[in-house]
Amino acid sequence: MSEVSGLPINRNPLSPGIPALRSGPRGLFDLLPLSVVLPAAAAGAAAGTAAVALHAQLWVSLAIGFGIALLGTIKIEQTNIWQILGMRIALRWRNRRGSAIQPAAAAFDVPVPESGGVHCGMRWDGRYMITMLEVGQATVAPTLLGPAQIRTDDAVPLTEAARCLSQFDIRLAAIDVVTQGVRTQGDQEVVRIYEQLLGPLPASAARTVRLALRFDPLDNTEAIDNRGGGDEGTIRTALVATRRVVSRLATDGVRVRMLTAAELTAADADALYDTAPQDWTEQWHTVRNDAVEMSGYTVRSGRLTSELLAGIWAVPGLSTLVRLRLTPVARSAGPGRAADEVAVTALVRHDTNATMPGDRPEMPAELGLRRLTGRQRRILLDGGHIDPATASSGPPAALARLAVPAAGSGQVIGATSDGFGVAVPLFGPAVRRVEIVGQLRLTQLMVLRAIAVGAKVIVHSTRPDAWSHLAAEVGEPTALSVSSPGGGAQHAAAATMIVYDGVGSAGQVAEATVLHVRAPGEVSAAVPGADVVLVESATDPHEVTIRTARGVLTVRAVTIPEESRYLDAAPDSVPQPA
C-alpha cells in the first residue's frame, strides 16, 4: 500500500479557478493572411492573363487563374505550396554555398553592485540584450510519474515569470524557459533494459532549466535615459530587469542564479554538443552532423497542455529540449503596467544518435506537434521566432496549467498503489549522501539503474565477489568497477557515485555522491545527514521506504525479468566491517 507522510506532492495540481489558455486569434486575416493571398492572387492573375494571350476560351482562362490562386492559398502544415517551393529552393541554395552563419556576439561580464563580487553575463542577439538565469533544485524529493503526467512540487512558476515581463519602468521583450533533459545515457545493454522498464513514463533523469531574458533597448528608451543613457544605461537597465526577476522568483521559493559570461557561452555551446552552428548540415526535416541528428517541432495552436509537455519526455533519444517563449501581448502591457495577456509558444527539439542503424525514435503524432519543415536551421541554430499563429494566450495565471519541473526526476525506484511510478535522484550535484538499508540485491538494482542514467560507479566492498559478477555483466569498466577495500583512489576521481559496502568512507569526494550500504536493521545509523535513504522492509523485500527532507514515501519495488540476469547470480552476504 502506498503511504505518504509529510510529502507534499500535489496529485491534483489544477484548480477549477485557473483560467484556460486560448489558441491565438483566428480571424479572417489569420486564416488567410495578405502575405499568402496577394501572391496567390497575383500568380492566378498572371496565369489567367497568359491563358488569354494564348487564345484560350474565357472560361478556361478563368478556371486556370482561379485554380492557381486557390492552389496558392491552400495550406499544408501552415505552409502553402509557394512557400514550400521557396523553402526547398532556399534549402538547396544554402547547402550548395555552404553555411554562412555569423558567429554569435561574444558575451561579457557586468559586475553586480553590492553583491560580493557576483557578475552577470550578457550578450547581444541582434537587437536584443540577452541575460540568463539557471534554476537550481530546491530539495531532493521523489517525483510521481504516470503516462503523460509528472507530479512534483519543485516546478518553475511560469505565472511569476510571466509577471516579470512588465516591471515598474522596464519591459522585457520575452522570457524563454529552456529545459534540456535526458532519459538515459549511454549505449550499454543496461540502458536498453531500463528503457523497457520506463515504457511510457515521462522520466527525465537529468534536467537543466534556464531562463533567457530578452531585453529590447528600443522598447525601453525612457528607462535607459533615466540610468545614464547610451551603452552604459542599456547595460544598467538590463541588469536591473534581471535582478528583479531573480528577486521575484526567489520570493516564490525558486533558487535561481545569474550566469556569468563564461557560463552563458558554455550553456550555448552545451545546447549544440560543443559544436559550432556551421558544423551542422540542414535537411528538410532535421539538422545533423556526424554524431547527432536534431529534429524541431512546434506545438499546434490550442494543444499546449501539461500532458503534452510531459508526454514529450516519454520519447527515447539522446536528449530533448523544450523552449517556452513568454511574450507580452502588445495591446495589453507596457512599462509600469502589468500585462493582462501573455502569449506562449513552444519549441521542441528531439535529438537522436545519427549513427544509429534503422529507424530513429520520433515524436508520436498524437502529441499534436508539427515539424519545422524547411526551417530547421533558422529556428534550431539561429534562434529564429516561431510562427505567432501557433501561440496560446491568456492571463499570467493561466500559465499555472503548464507544469515545468525544475530538476530531473532521477531514477525509478518503484510504484505507488495507485499506479504512479516513483523516481528519486540517487546521484548528482544536489545529492551528496545516500543510504540504502537492506539486502545486496536492492543496492545492486539501484546501482544498475543509476548506470543507465549516466552514473560512473566505483565500489569499495568487503564482498568484492558479489560486485564483480555485476561488473562483469555490465561489461563497461568506466561505468562500474570494483576496488578492494581502501584501494582504487585513482578511479574515484572520475566517479560520480562511490559505493561503500561494509567499508568506511574516506570522506566526501568532490562532485561524487557517496552511497553507504547498511545491513537490514541499521535504520537509526543511516538517517542523519543523508539526502536520500532507502529502507527495505524486513517482512516484504518488495516494499521500500524512501526518506528525504520532504518526507517519507513507501512504494512497491518494480523490476522486469531482464534485470534479473544481472542480479540473480550474484552471491549475497552480509557486509563485514573493514
Regions found by a protein language model. Give the residues of each.
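N-terminal topogenic membrane-targeting module
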Residues: 71-160, 166, 408, 412-413
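N-terminal alpha-helical membrane-insertion module
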Residues: 1-107, 422, 513-522, 528-541, ...
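Charged, often glycine-rich, active-site loop that binds/positions anionic groups
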Residues: 183-198
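Membrane-embedded segments
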Residues: 160, 172-175
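Short secondary-structure junctions
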Residues: 166-172
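Membrane-proximal, solvent-exposed terminal domains/tails of membrane-associated proteins
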Residues: 195-472, 487-491, 503, 513, ...
